Design a protein with these regions (language model features):
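Juxta-kinase regulatory segment immediately upstream of eukaryotic protein kinase catalytic domains
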Residues: 1-22
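ATP-binding pocket architecture of kinase catalytic cores
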Residues: 25-203, 220-223
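All-alpha amphipathic helical-bundle segments outside canonical DNA-binding/catalytic cores
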Residues: 156-157, 289-301
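Catalytic-loop of the protein kinase fold
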Residues: 203-205, 210
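Hydrophobic residue at the +6 position relative to the catalytic HRD Asp in the kinase catalytic loop
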Residues: 213-215
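Activation of the activation-loop gatekeeper triad in protein kinase-fold domains
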Residues: 229-234
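Active-site activation/catalytic loop segments of kinase-like enzymes and analogous catalytic loops
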Residues: 241-287, 301-319
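Helical subdomain adjoining the active site within ATP-dependent kinase catalytic cores
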Residues: 289-293, 307-348
Length: 348
């Protein structure tokens, strides 16, 4: 059995030794949609019972030094199991790179789908509003987690978080960039000059959006967010930075430029879905957060996303991406930089 990023025989042997209770692995398939860490479905059988697991591993090829840490993802979903934040069941972590060529972890398969575009699901206006409100409520729940009580007191350094984030993503840009973009350099300087006073410390997801959740869609029932996934950039930090990045992905009616960004789906254009400002206001009601500096955080979200997309583009140029949809992604970077400048100049 040949699947990019998986050494099947070694994985089967490791699972037999370390997680025999899940059954014998019978098949593997790449789950589509991921442009960062790779996600696979692992089918198993124990007696007459079939079960599905999910395996997460870093991407192939160019990998940034502080990104794609499987231990962090594993640790945070393990800590959140049993809290008000829905996450998949943690199953096992493997840090031995000899097994499949990189660290990985296994988690339970969640019945649900990543909803990105209107083609993925038909929603009534009532269901669209309920789903967007629930997305805001879960973000508030993440930020309300008592991170010390769940064992994440040392999961990050919230003091000076935004200043370090600006420095970190600037360094990542230098490592990943495939071209010179003077407007990116000007943006970095503007963000440093506009750095707001520190917000409260909270657990932050780092890449929160609807298609990083799994939504159960059942006939006759309202859509239900069953799990938040893709915790690779989670840490302790400023919760409004999480909100700002979510709004970076948001596609509002009349925003034609957003359609040119391959990193954004159009699910938020569904009639009834909250627009970006409505989403932010609902989050503020649920969390009690002060959104006075939200424009800065939206600009920072575009800045951060530009670096992430440039890293994906670099892997595509090297021929190291797995899956489809990478050929035009590099064109999104200058657009994201321009949108960040516009957020600073004009607001949300």
């Amino acid at each position: 059995m040949s699947t990019p990023g998986i050494n099947w025989s070694r994985l089967v042997a490791w699972m037999a030794s370390n997680v025999p209770d899940v059954g014998e692995p019978t098949g593997v398939s790449l789950i589509s949609g991921g442009k960062s860490n790779l996600t696979y479905r692992i089918d198993t059988r124990a007696g007459a019972e079939d079960r599905a697991l999910v395996l997460r591993r870093p991407p192939l090829g160019h990998v940034l030094p502080t990104a794609h840490d499987m231990r962090r993802e594993w640790r945070v979903i393990s800590a959140l199991a049993g809290t008000a934040v829905p996450v998949p069941e943690p199953v096992a972590l493997c840090v031995d790179e000899d097994v499949i060529g990189a660290p990985f972890y296994l988690m339970g398969h969640v019945e649900g789908q990543a909803v990105r575009g209107r083609q993925d699901v038909r929603l009534s206006p009532e269901d669209a509003r309920a789903l967007s409100e629930r997305l805001a409520e879960i973000l508030a729940a993440i930020h309300a987690v008592d991170y010390e009580a769940v064992g994440l007191a040392d999961f990050g350094r919230p003091d000076g978080y935004m200043a370090r984030q600006l420095e970190r993503w600037g360094q990542q840009w230098e490592r990943s960039k495939t071209r010179e973009l003077p407007e990116y350099d000007r943006l970095a300087a503007r963000l440093r000059d506009r750095l707001p006073a520190a917000s409260r410390a909270a657990l932050v997801h780092g890449d929160y959006r609807l298609d990083n959740t799994l939504v159960r869609l059942a006939p006759g029932a309202a859509p239900d967010i069953r799990a938040v996934v893709d915790w690779e950039m989670s840490t302790l930090g400023d919760p409004i930075a999480d909100l700002g990045l979510t709004l970076t992905y948001w596609h509002d009616p009349g925003d034609d430029e957003r359609s040119a960004l391959p990193v954004a789906g159009d699910i938020t254009l569904t009639p009834g879905f909250l627009d970006s400002r409505g989403f932010a206001e609902h989050y503020a009601r649920m969390s009690g957060a002060d959104l006075g500096d939200l424009d800065f955080y939206v600009a920072f979200g575009n800045y951060k996303l530009a670096v992430i997309v440039e890293g994906i583009h670099a892997r595509f140029v090297q021929g190291k991406t797995v899956g489809e949809g990478f050929d035009e992604i590099g064109a999104a970077v200058p657009l994201l930089v321009a949108r960040a400048h516009r957020a600073l100049d004009e607001g949300l």
